[in-house]
Amino acid sequence: MKLHELKPAEGSRKVRNRVGRGTSSGNGKTSGRGQKGQKARSGGGVRLGFEGGQTPLFRRLPKRGFTNINAKEYAIVNLDQLNVFEDGAEVTPVVLIEAGIVKAEKSGIKILGNGELTKKLTVKAAKFSKSAEEAITAKGGSVEVI
C-alpha cells in the first residue's frame, strides 16, 4: 500500500447536498422547502414554543416554586475520598482543593458518611453528617467545625 492508494473507509464521507441547482438535480426549484408559506421564506419558521396561536404549554401550566436566595450550597466530600491522605493528616478545605477532591469551596464543605474511612484524620469542615462524624471519631480522628 502506498500513500497515493489510500482511500477513506466506505460510507465515512458523504457528499454535501447542493440544493436549488436545476430541476433534474432532484433538489431544484423549491430546494426541498415545499410550496409557499412561512417555512418556505428566507428566515421563515416559528419561534421555539410557538403553537400556531394556541396558548403554548409553558403558559397553560402554573408557575411553581421559587429560588431561595439565602440557600447555601455545600461542596460534598464522602468518607472514602479521604483515604488518599496519610494517617494522622489534617484535612482542611484548602488541602481538599489542592488534592483535587473538591473543585471549589462554595458555601463550605460538608463531609458525608458514604464509604469506609481507613485512616486516623483530623478533619476541618463547615458541616458533618452524623454518620461521618461517628466514623471519623471511631477511627481515633477528630472533627472540627469551621
From Swiss-Prot:
GO cellular component: cytosolic large ribosomal subunit
Region (Disordered): 1-51
Biased composition annotated in UniProt, kind: Gly residues: 23-35, 42-51
Keyword Ribonucleoprotein: yes
GO molecular function, one term: structural constituent of ribosome
Biased composition (Basic and acidic residues): 1-13
PROSITE patterns membership: RIBOSOMAL_L15
Family from the record: Belongs to the universal ribosomal protein uL15 family.
Subunit structure: Part of the 50S ribosomal subunit.
Protein name: Large ribosomal subunit protein uL15
Organism (species): Streptococcus pneumoniae serotype 2 (strain D39 / NCTC 7466)
Gene name, Swiss-Prot/TrEMBL: rplO
